[in-house]
Amino acid sequence: MTRLTGLRRPLLPIAGAKQAPEQAIDGPQVEVPLTAVDRRRVRRRLHAPDGAELQLAFPTGTVLSPGTVLGTRGGVSYVVSAAPEDVAVVVPRTLAEAAHTAHAVGNLHRDFVEDAGAFLTPWDAPIELLLTRLGVPFTRETRPFHGRPSWEHEG
């Protein structure tokens, strides 16, 4: 019999990843556009659109969601926004087609995120091939993506 006591990690994933602490925004703000991949890189330096250099040092595992305050300098708050990136925009014709497509995309360990009546997933060659084989209507667009990057899979 296998013993499951003393595990360092929980056996089942905990709902939701660590989120950066919420801070009140007071005064002017500068949006710092970050892609889904960049929003997972929480220990680094980056340059804001106004030229300010920000040094990030959030705890490992933190997810920088849009609206997270990265820091404040001289009364200006630097806030995360979702940068436009290459995505497949899928518009299934039926609920059954949506479920079948979501299942197939999930088998490739990709997020399938609802956005304004369509579904988005990061664009790459395997996704293009899959969607073409399924015969589901899709287009390639540049839009903000709020899911996880294609290489990250929970479980």
From Swiss-Prot:
SUPFAM superfamilies: Urease metallochaperone UreE, C-terminal domain (SSF69737), Urease metallochaperone UreE, N-terminal domain (SSF69287)
Single GO cellular component term: cytoplasm
Superkingdom of this protein's organism: Bacteria
GO biological process: protein folding
Pfam families with a match to the protein in the record: UreE_N (PF02814)
Keyword terms of this UniProt record: Chaperone, Cytoplasm, Nickel, Nickel insertion
UniProt-annotated location(s): Cytoplasm
Keyword Hydrolase among record annotations: no
Single GO term (MF): unfolded protein binding
SMART domains: UreE_N
InterPro entries referenced in this protein's UniProt entry, alphabetically: UreE, UreE_N, UreE_N_sf
Family: Belongs to the UreE family.
Function of the protein: Involved in urease metallocenter assembly. Binds nickel. Probably functions as a nickel donor during metallocenter assembly.
HAMAP family to which the protein is assigned, alphabetical: UreE
Database matches in NCBIfam families: PRK13261.2-2 (NF009756)
Name recorded for this polypeptide: Urease accessory protein UreE
Gene source species: Deinococcus radiodurans (strain ATCC 13939 / DSM 20539 / JCM 16871 / CCUG 27074 / LMG 4051 / NBRC 15346 / NCIMB 9279 / VKM B-1422 / R1)
